[in-house]
Amino acid sequence: MATVSAAAATSVVARAVLAGPLGLPQMRARRSERVRCNYSKEAATPAAAVKGAGASLLAMAATAAPAMALVDERMSTEGTGLSLGLSNNLLGWILLGVFGLIWSLYTIYTSDLEEDEESGGLSL
């Protein structure tokens, strides 16, 4: 089994420098390191292979959870990002129609009310 490993010879030194027109600090890194990469066709030890497989499985499970989410007709529109949870355009027109009907009935009702001096325009 082939293995690939990488190791840094020295560390990166970073320091904040105040420069630029906005006066914001900039991070600069001094690159005095070399990266060494090794490749060998020798078989890895079984314990190391099992640990590596477990780590890669854990990383895959942690990042793939959103991709494995179940979205179908049984869930309707929960979590699908549709506005107001409307899966059908007809539902939007029904909501708009009911709102318009109630608003028009309220407007007609309030136009028939008599305003007197005591209410001061604050009548229900």
UniProtKB/Swiss-Prot annotation:
Name of the featured protein: Photosystem II reaction center W protein, chloroplastic
Entry function: Stabilizes dimeric photosystem II (PSII). In its absence no dimeric PSII accumulates and there is a reduction of monomeric PSII.
InterPro entries, per database record: PSII_PsbW_class2
Quaternary structure (record): Part of the photosystem II complex. PSII is composed of 1 copy each of membrane proteins PsbA, PsbB, PsbC, PsbD, numerous small proteins, at least 3 peripheral proteins of the oxygen-evolving complex and a large number of cofactors. It forms dimeric complexes.
One Pfam match: PsbW
Highest taxon above the source species: Eukaryota
Keyword Mitochondrion recorded: no
Family assignment from sequence similarity: Belongs to the psbW family.
Species of the source: Oryza sativa subsp. japonica (Rice)
GO biological process: photosynthesis; photosystem II stabilization
Keyword rRNA-binding: no
Segments in the Stromal topological domain: 111-124
Extent of the transit peptide: 1-36, 37-72
Subcellular location(s) of the protein: Plastid, Chloroplast thylakoid membrane
Residues in the Lumenal, thylakoid compartment per record: 73-89
Gene Ontology CC, one term: chloroplast thylakoid membrane
Coiled coil residues, start to end: none
